[in-house]
């Protein structure tokens, strides 16, 4: 993962309405194994984060100037340090307007992954821990807590520059229940949601369920194809990449690589050729689970409609082919 440019600034602010104080670095960070490891860990944590949203820049304006500064940097009008400085000053201003915001170290990293250029921006915080010294003493130790990543965004620069129709070249952590505490960070990037990740994923899963039903597949085959879909989607989510419908179709049925793709197009589900994978929605698709008053039920989603029938009006489940272990226990009860 070649790192083109990387810099860190510090905004010191407490969530009490006090002014935000900027401590800006005046030069880029030199290449090092530590920087590479930090960015690799950041990407891993970011990709694993649930609740991300995908979108595109608002038209450049006084309210949303970030995309203009980024374009100026990419066009050679200013260097990376100057770009990050004007951007972090804008973030500082928005922080002061948001009483709930807290400061932290602001990372800007322009890097390449494969043939694609990305810009990652993250607000990082420290955690207090302990370490053992060479003299075997235990001493306090501070470290960047990349596992607790709450404000971060990643811009696919290549997609932004080369695909003017794209509405998903920016991803950002949306926050639980769309918390307003993170809105200032989204406004800092100047991002508007262009793709409903959970909604698109739900539509894809609905299309897949319809496909399996229309093909009248045996249970083993349905289970195998379900696993293929979920594994592929989870893998793409881990990489931070969207799911390609044509690629997915080829994986689902190698003998008929276009079958699922043609099903999606013919039924007009309205899906884009590439969609972001929402991990929370995928996890719900794997299994249905529920627990109440001493009763716990969990079953694989593909069993619904075959071994398990749901009567919505009566609020009942009918289970066919009970596990032998369960029937033995029930028999022993008598």
Swiss-Prot record:
Give the Gene Ontology MF terms in alphabetical order: double-stranded DNA binding; single-stranded RNA binding
Any one GO CC term of the record? cytoplasm
Superkingdom is Bacteria
List, alphabetically, the InterPro entries matched.
Nucleoid_associated_NdpA
List where in the cell it is found.
Cytoplasm, Nucleoid
Regarding protein family, the annotation reads: Belongs to the YejK family.
Q: What is the name listed in the Swiss-Prot or TrEMBL entry for this protein?
A: Nucleoid-associated protein PFL_1060
């Amino acid at each position: 993962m070649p790192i083109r440019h990387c810099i860190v600034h510090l905004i010191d602010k407490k969530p009490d309405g006090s002014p935000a104080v900027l401590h800006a670095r005046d030069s880029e960070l030199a290449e090092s194994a530590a920087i590479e490891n930090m960015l690799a860990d950041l990407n891993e944590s970011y990709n694993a984060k649930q609740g991300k949203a995908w979108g595109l820049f608002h038209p450049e304006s006084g309210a949303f100037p970030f995309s203009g500064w980024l374009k100026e940097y990419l066009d050679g009008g200013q260097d990376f340090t100057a770009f990050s400085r004007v951007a972090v000053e804008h973030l500082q201003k928005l922080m002061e307007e948001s009483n709930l915001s807290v400061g932290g170290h602001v990372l800007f990293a322009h890097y390449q992954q494969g043939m694609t250029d990305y810009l990652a921006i993250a607000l990082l915080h420290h955690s207090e821990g302990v370490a053992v010294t060479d003299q075997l003493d235990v001493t306090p130790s501070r470290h960047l807590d990349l596992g607790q990543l709450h404000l971060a965004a990643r811009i696919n620069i290549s997609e932004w520059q080369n695909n003017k129709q794209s509405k998903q070249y920016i991803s950002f952590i949306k926050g639980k229940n769309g918390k307003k505490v993170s809105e200032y960070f989204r406004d800092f990037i100047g991002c508007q949601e262009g793709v409903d990740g959970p909604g698109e994923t739900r539509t894809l899963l609905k299309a897949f369920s319809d496909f399996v039903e229309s093909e009248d597949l045996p249970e083993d085959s349905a289970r195998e194809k379900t696993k293929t879909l979920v594994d592929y989607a989870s893998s793409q989510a881990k990489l931070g990449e969207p799911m390609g419908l044509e690629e997915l179709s080829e994986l689902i049925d190698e003998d008929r690589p276009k079958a699922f793709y043609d099903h999606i197009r013919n039924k007009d589900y309205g899906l884009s050729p590439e969609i972001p994978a929402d991990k929370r929605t995928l996890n719900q698709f794997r299994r249905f689970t529920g627990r109440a008053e001493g009763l716990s039920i969990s079953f694989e989603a593909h069993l619904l409609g075959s071994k398990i029938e749901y009567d919505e009006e009566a609020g009942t489940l009918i289970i066919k082919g009970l596990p032998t272990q369960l029937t033995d226990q029930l028999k022993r009860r008598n």
